[in-house]
Amino acid sequence: QHGRVVDVCNVKDEGAMGMDRAGGLPVNQLINYCFSGKTKDEVKRTFGRRAGMFSYLGTTDFRVVCAKVVEGDPKAVEAYQALVYQLAKDIGAMAAVLHFDVDAIVYTAGMAYEDFFCDDITAYVGKIAPIIRLPGEEEMRSLAEGALRVLRGQQEASQY
């Protein structure tokens, strides 16, 4: 808000599932799973690398997921619809934090290359704000450019 981060959704701990992360989970079921004889490392591996879309479809490649959806694979369609729903819900929650005074909703990373995926999310959230698509991976470049600005004295390091 006004150029500052006011809230985040840490994909390692909460929010929508990802390609290999579980996202937010029902607490009671999670507790039961944790006490089902699994070690701590097994539980962490399951929810941190073998969950999300991977747990349904055996892949972390979103292009493969989309191909299965286009082919009409029922399991892929169901998992895909759950992902879209969860992401739309998270976008709506973040819009609420901003009192729905949102300048834009930005779709980034590799998933933003898929037209129908962006269209499906936009069907839920498109009335909130204009949609901007910036497909591709820019995280490392952005981090490097930010660090360079700090090292050159052009910007102070931010603490979060």
Language-model regions, residue ranges each:
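Active-site proximal loops enriched in glycine and acidic residues that flank catalytic Cys/His/Asp
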Residues: 9, 106-109, 135
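Glycine-rich phosphate-binding loops at beta-strand->alpha-helix junctions
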Residues: 102-121
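Glycine-rich phosphate-binding loop plus the immediately following alpha-helix
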Residues: 6-60
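Adenine-nucleotide phosphate-binding core of ATP-dependent small-molecule kinases
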Residues: 45-100
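Glycine-rich phosphate-binding/hydrolytic loop that grips phosphoryl groups
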Residues: 112-113, 119, 130-160
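Predominant activation on well-ordered alpha-helical scaffold segments within soluble catalytic domains
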Residues: 27-35, 41-48, 63-66, 88, ...
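A glycine- and small-aliphatic-rich helix-loop capping segment at beta-alpha/alpha-beta transitions
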Residues: 2-6, 11-13, 120-128, 154-156
